[in-house]
């Protein structure tokens, strides 16, 4: 019961879930009512899905630049007489007072390039990612034969040990998770062992989910040591449990820390984060 459920939550093979720190796992399961099999909490979903609140947040940002990938992040040299960060895009380079890198840790390291410091490389490099393939389709044949056995999450165990250890296979029955206006089953299959019928496939997507092993949990605890160094801050779902709420929480924490740093500058206090 426990390993398949955790594999579904974190989109990781059950073999990797065995390496998940026990204290962190129990704390999460207890907080979310997952340890008990019956009388679980009633979950709510956002009307319109996650894009609804993303759009609401974007509407409050006056100069949001979607579709403008950043190619590199360059810190202004401390001996230049000024401070800040340069962002390089296909449209050119632009200087900012500070930057919050809110992507995956390997993406942040790639953006920093040679300017990544040793402690940043050690911490960000400790977070590993699990590649997953998601297929959106309407082929109900991937679900259990008995319709009464259909669940919101349908875990499939592979008879091949190598496949079972490399990727988790599960089928999300979206009709059970979101109030869709269709009676026909709509599914998202993660790493399907048997391909859905071609005529039922509506999209394929590649994802990378953080793996929360002992090294990752230890890296999370060290995050304050690199925050704000050289005016670079970090945020993302990887800083906690890997969910949307964790990404939001870390973003708010980074914003509060930035505000405190700027308040200290306005008051004439030295910027502690610039010391290293």
Each predicted region: which residue ranges?
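Short, hydrophobic alpha-helical segments
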Residues: 61, 97, 258-262
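Conserved flavin/dinucleotide-binding core of flavoenzymes
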Residues: 164-276
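Mid-domain catalytic core of redox enzymes
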Residues: 69-210
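A structural signal for the hydrophobic beta-strands that form the central parallel beta-sheet
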Residues: 64-66, 101, 234
